[in-house]
Design a protein with these regions (language model features):
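GGW-centered surface loops in extracellular recognition modules
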Residues: 1-41
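C-terminal, surface-exposed recognition/capping segments
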Residues: 62-204
Length: 204
């Protein structure tokens, strides 16, 4: 969202700057690809909607209050989740099987004409959160609470409280939303959000 305007990118919580993308002709504007197509630009390598549910349900989240740094500033708090390869091994599945269907065998990357609002069943929380860095941290990825940039203002919000991450799957029933995942101290959440907001890309 701030490519080419890094010098004005907000780096403190609740900081605002107007140099965010506002119109679709801006190269930084979100990709308007419609479901069931998948992301083809910056989010193309992010997990799909099915994989996010595997992270949510079998990632054994650990909240870690440790300090991390970004853009020359220090912040604290983030969530450890098991790597997808570890989840696949634990569940006796292949990575391709995790990509092809969520737990319960629904494939949220496909259209279901008889259930156009299937995304309503997608929204879920995991509140079974352990405290502290996992001892076998090499089996996990760390998601910092970087917050997100709010459309309409360019405001950096929820820094140090939430971390928002995009999937590679647009949400059906219109083209504005995509499936996402967020973390905070007491939960991991999967759902969907407005693509005009700027979320983080998946670190794995």
């Amino acid at each position: 969202a701030w490519k080419g305007f890094e010098s004005s990118q907000p780096i403190l919580n609740d900081e605002i700057d107007s140099n965010y993308p506002k119109i679709s002709s801006d190269a930084r504007w979100y990709n308007p690809v419609m479901h069931p197509a998948t992301a083809s630009r910056s989010a193309k390598d992010c997990p799909n909607a099915n994989e996010f549910l595997w992270y949510l349900m079998y990632g054994e989240p650990h909240w870690d209050p440790s300090i991390w740094s970004i853009m020359k500033h220090l912040y604290d708090g983030g969530m450890w989740l098991k790597k997808l390869s570890v989840i696949a091994k634990d569940q006796h599945k292949t990575l391709q099987e995790l990509k092809a269907a969520a737990p319960g065998e629904t494939d949220y990357t496909k259209n279901y004409p008889s259930a156009p609002k299937i995304y309503e069943a997608y929204v879920k929380d995991n509140t079974n959160i352990k405290l502290g860095k996992p001892t076998n941290s090499s089996d996990y990825i760390f998601l910092p609470t970087f917050g997100y940039y709010l459309a309409g203002t360019g405001k950096l919000t929820f820094l140090g409280r939430y971390g928002y991450y995009w999937s590679s799957t647009p949400r059906p029933d219109g083209g504005l939303n995509a499936y996402n995942l967020y973390i905070r101290r007491d939960k991991v959440h999967v759902g969907y959000g407005d693509r005009t907001n700027a979320h983080c890309l998946w670190p794995e």
